[in-house]
């Protein structure tokens, strides 16, 4: 489980970097290393906070305190919390799929298509593993809510509290999760230094 958690944490860091920085490099062999130079390489992202994970040194920062919306990177934190609270044996257990897991985005006219996972309310054959796979699909918001509902003991709000506690534990500053899926919420921008 610790390997999975380390992998998920690395995935979170990688996703934050990918969302923050677009750098393309081609290596002819595995020994080649791309040297990023912020003085000569074009940075397309509006905000960046890049850290060398081996040394903890800040490699590059741009608008690091500017509040940005994290969108689907939120689902990576949802995945981390889920993996921390589920044993390998639990992955095959079925989950409850109540209407509560769908209401917050289908009742809001701002969310035109919050799902690509084709999960239906009251579906009775869905497992934790299915939800974790669906979670990584674009806009599979109901999968995030289903995980939050089930792991939070029937309370999505309780799960969101777990996400915020984990963010603090990881040293994320200025981070405040208000949902498990990352759909837009005016109360939720975080700075690039947030994670």
Give the ranges of each region predicted by the language model.
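Active-site-adjacent loops and short helices of periplasmic peptidoglycan-processing enzymes
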Residues: 27-193
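Gram-positive cell-envelope targeting signals
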Residues: 1-31
């Amino acid at each position: 489980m610790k390997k999975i958690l380390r992998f998920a944490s690395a995935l979170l860091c990688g996703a934050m970097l990918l969302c923050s920085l677009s750098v393309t490099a081609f290596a002819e062999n595995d020994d080649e290393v791309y040297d990023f130079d912020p003085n000569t390489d074009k940075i397309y992202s509006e905000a960046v906070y890049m850290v060398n994970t081996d040394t903890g040194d800040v490699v590059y920062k741009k608008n690091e305190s500017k509040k940005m919306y994290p969108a689907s990177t939120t689902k990576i934190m949802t995945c981390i919390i889920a993996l921390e609270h589920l044993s390998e044996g639990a992955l095959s257990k079925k989950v409850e799929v109540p209407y509560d897991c769908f209401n917050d985005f289908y009742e809001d006219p701002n969310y035109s298509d919050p799902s690509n996972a084709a999960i239906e309310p009251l579906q009775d054959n869905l497992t934790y593993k299915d939800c974790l796979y669906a979670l990584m699909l674009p806009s599979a918001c109901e999968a995030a809510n289903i995980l939050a509902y089930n792991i939070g003991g029937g309370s999505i709000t309780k799960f969101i509290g777990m996400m915020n506690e984990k963010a603090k534990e990881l040293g994320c500053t200025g981070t405040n999760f208000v949902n498990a899926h990352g759909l837009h919420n005016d109360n939720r921008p975080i700075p690039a230094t947030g994670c």
